[in-house]
Every structure is written in structure tokens, then in C-alpha cells.
């Protein structure tokens, strides 16, 4: 069994459902410390939702290669996994790593314990071949990415920024591939902005509408306009910004009562062509123009970020090409990731991991043939970046 596969299985065997790390970070710290990594725990959150965070960094100064402008590459990942769902529906126990049909089954197999294991082993191999690297290498790992994402990477980034930590390149180990490891990487993500709109009316008997004011009827024209609005046209890297309703709550449950209010939840996934502030202003303008009596609360889940083709993208592309022969596709599709926090202090962020077809599903799995190539791509990327750091 390869070291990468063995470490992946050891991580899967730890039932690390958010925010419980279940010992994953301790296991990883024990692997990293002998390589010269300084391992720092930056746990955060209340006792009933305590989040485990690890910042682990190896400085080029250890080998006397540090320069005033030494660059840092960081791998970002999460040890937490989503709940299993009905255990009886799994073909094998979700936290018992199981091989079947050329695949490794278990919760977290593809999201994202294979990626973490692959990077750790890639670092081991890289340092064995390059004992005096010219770049700093770091790992930022958390047990709160699948949950609220309040006390995880976000908190660590705030602390790193406060003490002036420099990050130049970041690889997030999210499962980005489609059919084969390396066929797609994410070089950005859309922003996410949610709103909860409460439209107030006057409750009354449905047979006497003249004595009431139906908030649903009042809201519909405004909602129709919002749904039809073209917010932007997107650009070469992002699709157009989208606005979608997710929930509508109104009524008392009775069929003869006009409700006193209706609550609508909605979400923007927005490109770099729009700003959160601009979208908020445009929504308020529509609601005001329709004369609604309303309250609206906003939650900004993350700003969009984009890494244009440059040092990091090219290093990863070269590594993928050398390992697999693939010309990888750059994409900004999909949901959010912790990359949105890291991009605040790191100018180049990409995401690369195994295929994502089974993530969050019953019988989550990763193909065995996708694991070693991922490790090799990470190692080759380190080699490319090390050459850049010494240029």
C-alpha cells in the first residue's frame, strides 16, 4: 500500500464530522514535525462548537536558503466531513475505509482527505529530494469548512494577517476534477450574498380582501422583476451573476386567512463584474419602486476571487501536463470554498483535487488511480514553485 493511500485511510477512519476533528490534526502534525514544520494550534469557537485549526509552516531558513524575499506556498484543507446520512444505506461503514471495484469508499474520501494525504506525502517526497528548498511551505487545516465556516480558516487568516504573515501561492485541496484528477482546476470562485426579505401586509379574512392587505400579492411583481433582472454579463472567467429564491414562508396554515407577512430567502452568486454593495442597492431600488413595506437583512458569505493565469496557474498546469498529459480546464463554477478567505491575503489561489462526483453522497469514494497522480501533481508543483522562488 502506498504511503498516500495509507494516510488517506487513516484519516477516513477518524469520524471527523463538523466541527469534530477526531484527531486528524494531531496525526498530521506528527507527520509534519519531523520534516521541520512548526505546528501551531489556533483552535477557536465556543465549547459547544469548538473548531480545531492547525497552522504548520516550514521555513527555508532551516536550510540556510531563506532570503529577504523568500516566498511561501500554502496548502489549505479541511479535515471535517459532512454527516453520513442513513448509515444503513451505505454499502460499507462510512468510517471504515473499504476497497471495492477499484475505489476507496468512506466519508471524506474525495472531500477532502485524499487531497490532504496527497499533499503531505508530496511534501515528504519533495523534501527528501530537495533538502534545501528555497521556499517556505505551510499547511492551513481546519475542522470547520463544511459547517458555518466562522471559526475555521477565517479566524486563522485574521491572525496571520494581524502578525504580517506573507502568503504568495495557495493550493486548496477541494475536489475540483470531473472525470480524472487534473482535468479541471478552480482559479476563482463567485461571491455569495444572501438576503431575507420580510414583506408586511395586513392579516384578514380571505373573503374580505378589502379589509386586509395581502403581502404575497404585493411581493409577487417585485419578485418577478428581480428574477428577470440581468445583473451583469459576466466576463471571460465568470458566468453572469445569478439571483435565486430558495424559500418562501407565508400564511398561518389555514386556507381562509390572508397572511400578515411573507418571508422570502434569496441568494446571489456574483461575478467580479458586480459588488455586494451594488447588488444590495439595486434590490432595494426595486422593492422601493414597488412600494413595499418590508425589512431586509443581508449576509455576505464571501467575495468573489480570481487568480488570472500566472506563476501558480502555470506551475499547476505544467505539473498536470507532465503527470497526466492533460490540458487542464480553468473554471470558476460551483459553490464557495475557504479560498474566499485566503484570497484576502494571498494574491494567487487555486483549487485542485480529485473528481467530485460522489462528494456528500452515500458511498462517497475516490478512484484508487486518482490518488497517486494527485500526489505527484502536488510534488511537481512544489518543484516548479521552488525554482521560481530561487529565480
Swiss-Prot record:
Binds 2 Zn(2+) or Co(2+) ions per subunit. Zn(2+) 1 binds at residues 78, 111, 174. Its EC number is 3.5.1.18. Its cofactor is Zn(2+); Co(2+). One of its GO terms (molecular function) is cobalt ion binding. InterPro entries: ArgE/DapE_CS (IPR001261), Bact_exopeptidase_dim_dom (IPR036264), DapE_proteobac (IPR005941), Peptidase_M20 (IPR002933), Peptidase_M20_dimer (IPR011650), Peptidase_M20A (IPR050072). It comes from the Bacteria. The active site is at residues 80, 145. It holds the Pfam family M20_dimer. It catalyses: N-succinyl-(2S,6S)-2,6-diaminopimelate + H2O = (2S,6S)-2,6-diaminopimelate + succinate. GO terms for biological process: diaminopimelate biosynthetic process; L-arginine biosynthetic process; lysine biosynthetic process via diaminopimelate. Keywords: Amino-acid biosynthesis, Cobalt, Diaminopimelate biosynthesis, Hydrolase, Lysine biosynthesis, Metal-binding, Zinc. SUPFAM superfamilies: Bacterial exopeptidase dimerisation domain (SSF55031), Zn-dependent exopeptidases (SSF53187). Gene3D superfamilies: Zn peptidases (3.40.630.10). Pathway: Amino-acid biosynthesis; L-lysine biosynthesis via DAP pathway; LL-2,6-diaminopimelate from (S)-tetrahydrodipicolinate (succinylase route): step 3/3. Zn(2+) 2 binds at residues 111, 146, 360. Catalyzes the hydrolysis of N-succinyl-L,L-diaminopimelic acid (SDAP), forming succinate and LL-2,6-diaminopimelate (DAP), an intermediate involved in the bacterial biosynthesis of lysine and meso-diaminopimelic acid, an essential component of bacterial cell walls. Belongs to the peptidase M20A family. DapE subfamily. Homodimer. This is Succinyl-diaminopimelate desuccinylase. It comes from Acidovorax sp. (strain JS42). The lineage of its organism: Bacteria, Pseudomonadati, Pseudomonadota, Betaproteobacteria, Burkholderiales. The gene is dapE.
